[in-house]
């Protein structure tokens, strides 16, 4: 089965880290209910208030499928409120896993 990854980079203020970590699992569960192609997500703190949000998908067009249901988001919007200046770094197919 093919797997795809989308990576976003964002700034997270020090005071927003705990609320982000509390809401992110619930927001991802909400997103999975809306788009079962979302397999999971990882938050990575790379320092200097910069974080990566790595989303794993089962279909190449999963991001578009999820965004088509954006009006149904609740917790996803809350989570995005903690991710300042978020930008997509890239999206692609996983070609090797060791």
Regions found by a protein language model. Give the residues of each.
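Conserved beta-strand elements flanking the ATP-binding pocket of the protein kinase catalytic core
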Residues: 42
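Short, solvent-exposed polar/charged micro-motifs at secondary-structure junctions
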Residues: 51-55, 98
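Short, surface-exposed ligand-recognition loops at beta-strand->loop->(often short) alpha-helix junctions
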Residues: 11-22
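Short, histidine-centered active-site or binding-site loop motifs used for metal coordination
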Residues: 8-12, 57-58, 93
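Active-site-flanking beta-strand signature of metal-NTP-handling nucleotidyl enzymes
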Residues: 3-11, 52
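Catalytic "initiation/cleavage/transfer" segments centered on a nucleophilic residue
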Residues: 91-98
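An amphipathic, aromatic/His-enriched active-site/gating alpha helix that lines ligand/cofactor pockets
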Residues: 26-39, 56-90
């Amino acid at each position: 089965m093919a797997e795809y990854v989308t990576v976003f980079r964002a700034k997270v203020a020090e005071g927003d880290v705990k609320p982000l970590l509390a809401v992110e699992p619930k927001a991802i569960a909400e997103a999975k209910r809306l788009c079962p192609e979302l397999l999971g997500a990882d938050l990575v703190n790379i320092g200097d208030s910069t974080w990566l949000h790595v989303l794993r998908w089962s279909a190449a067009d999963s991001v578009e499928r999820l965004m088509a249901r954006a009006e149904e988001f609740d917790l996803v919007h809350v989570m995005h409120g903690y991710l300042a200046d978020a930008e997509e770094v890239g999206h692609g197919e996983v070609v090797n896993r060791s």
